[in-house]
Amino acid sequence: MPSTDLLMLKAFEPYLEILEVYSTKAKNYVNGHCTKYEPWQLIAWSVVWTLLIVWGYEFVFQPESLWSRFKKKCFKLTRKMPIIGRKIQDKLNKTKDDISKNMSFLKVDKEYVKALPSQGLSSSAVLEKLKEYSSMDAFWQEGRASGTVYSGEEKLTELLVKAYGDFAWSNPLHPDIFPGLRKIEAEIVRIACSLFNGGPDSCGCVTSGGTESILMACKAYRDLAFEKGIKTPEIVAPQSAHAAFNKAASYFGMKIVRVPLTKMMEVDVRAMRRAISRNTAMLVCSTPQFPHGVIDPVPEVAKLAVKYKIPLHVDACLGGFLIVFMEKAGYPLEHPFDFRVKGVTSISADTHKYGYAPKGSSLVLYSDKKYRNYQFFVDTDWQGGIYASPTIAGSRPGGISAACWAALMHFGENGYVEATKQIIKTARFLKSELENIKGIFVFGNPQLSVIALGSRDFDIYRLSNLMTAKGWNLNQLQFPPSIHFCITLLHARKRVAIQFLKDIRESVTQIMKNPKAKTTGMGAIYGMAQTTVDRNMVAELSSVFLDSLYSTDTVTQGSQMNGSPKPH
């Protein structure tokens, strides 16, 4: 009795014969047309067409989309047109001047030091000069700035200064010379791993800030993707994820795929699933995201990470040292967010925010050392010896790590729980009151310390302008237009919530008398930047802002620049 395989083969015999006939005809047709060409011509045409196909593929499938490049080219050509281009440039120059004037914080009677003094100054003279510089700062001590300074408490400052001083000359690059500093950094990482419920194989690194922490995670997953054969690794991140992911994509030759949000300003998990491709190197969640203070659904995204075997990074730079204490503070979160969630492979958390360490201190943590190894840079062939560094920097200030360790030890678990309790209590009170003010609304359901406001009745940047006039410094956001206030321990202890609400109510009442009025000042510039289709022009204006930071030219001072574009 014939086998099943033999019967199936016999059934397909007619089709195989038909296929053979057509393949023979195709072969004869091609050979017939090639007889009129010499062999060298066939080879030349094959090479040319191969190169054209490769060029076409690379041209179409670049990290930046074809449509985006087409728009840039059109805008560039438009700006070169005689009449239209001149008008655009005139308006652009005026806006640049406005930004430069608003960036001039130097008083009229002050000048910049542009050369070394011929004779060195005494210690007292240097300190007196620095005191003059510090007096130029805005009065952040009053608790009117969004985020920025997260404690500022005098006794803590004294402790941090002393800790930094004791390690001022130390450098983690030389663990053999500074073993105490190595111990400090190892302890900081292990404490953080414990707080985020990492297992025995969890690990991490101390970095200079949230941006570097994010960059390091992206670099690790890029190299992991390279090992898997992915040539153009993609970062799939929510629209609200920090701009540092764009910076990582730019620095490391990756492509970022932004995923839309739901009405509650959380990442749309279905859209994220659709965005996953064979080139996806990592997924991203925020806890919370910077613009609106909303926590992404980490467990749901983690399921995608497990299903498709893709690393998941949780960006907790802003709220990391709040969320780990929320439950003990009496404000438990609805879903887990850390290494307890299967699929979470890395977390970034800033100790220089709600960890109350000095600026320049952050952490990137991994669930397993196998991921961290991809972050490291090692050069085995340098003439100066084998060069290996865990993060971007080579030399780093040991004093910052010492001060970070001091802050962790000084607060302890109870101190952090109490601080979290004060901050969240203040934030929840503000949120409930702001939701009841007619003319504005709160974005999403912020559960931590950031509250974002919008309006359906007027340009929200007008509210930012009026609050600036009252001495507040809020952050301006875009897509959609909004502003936010980040509550810190300084705000909670200064009890500024009542005054903040009073000023918001007064400002909204004033605006609602003429809700359609146009925004002026920096609010208008920010609004214009959001509606400008040519994003290269916006980037050009942003460069003016960055240039101004290092300018030593004396410029006539304009009105105060509100809604700082920088993150906390």
UniProtKB/Swiss-Prot annotation:
InterPro entries: GrpII_AminoAcid_Decarb, PyrdxlP-dep_de-COase, PyrdxlP-dep_Trfase, PyrdxlP-dep_Trfase_major, PyrdxlP-dep_Trfase_small
Ranges annotated as spanning the membrane: 41-61
GO biological process: androgen metabolic process; apoptotic signaling pathway; ceramide metabolic process; estrogen metabolic process; face morphogenesis; fatty acid metabolic process; fibroblast migration; hemopoiesis
Pathway the protein contributes to: Lipid metabolism; sphingolipid metabolism
Organism: Homo sapiens
Catalytic activity as recorded in UniProt: sphinganine 1-phosphate = hexadecanal + phosphoethanolamine; sphing-4-enine 1-phosphate = (2E)-hexadecenal + phosphoethanolamine
Protein name: Sphingosine-1-phosphate lyase 1
UniProtKB keywords: Acetylation, Apoptosis, Disease variant, Endoplasmic reticulum, Lipid metabolism, Lyase, Membrane, Nitration, Phosphoprotein, Pyridoxal phosphate, Signal-anchor, Sphingolipid metabolism, Transmembrane, Transmembrane helix
Positions where 3'-nitrotyrosine occurs in the chain: 356, 366
